[in-house]
Amino acid sequence: MWRKKQMTRKQRVDFVHLLGDLLQNGFSLQQAFAFFINANLFAPSILEAVQQDLHQGKSLALSFTQLRYSNDQLLQIELAETHGDLAQTLLGIAEQMRLVQRQRENFLKAVSYPLLLLV
């Protein structure tokens, strides 16, 4: 089922949102990743690589670099790890990513309409 080794943009949004929800509802990081793997929601190879990084003592932010989150998002995660409220930060990142996606879609609609009229 999972052939790609990278998550799509939508999968990254869903992943960070669901992880934030699980953490907010009392799951530990280990429990959340076990849930993701058992439910087969995301590519197991990616999740296992992140899990392995965490077991080796790497920070969550450093582990997320392989998931292609932006440097700004990784910085937010790093600060949340240091100062607390990781769950809320992850939910905020998901909302920000959704907003950017909506703006991108609206921009493409606005640009494509005049081009359609010219053709």
Describe the function of each predicted region.
Residues 1-116:
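Catalytic metal-binding core of the metallo-beta-lactamase
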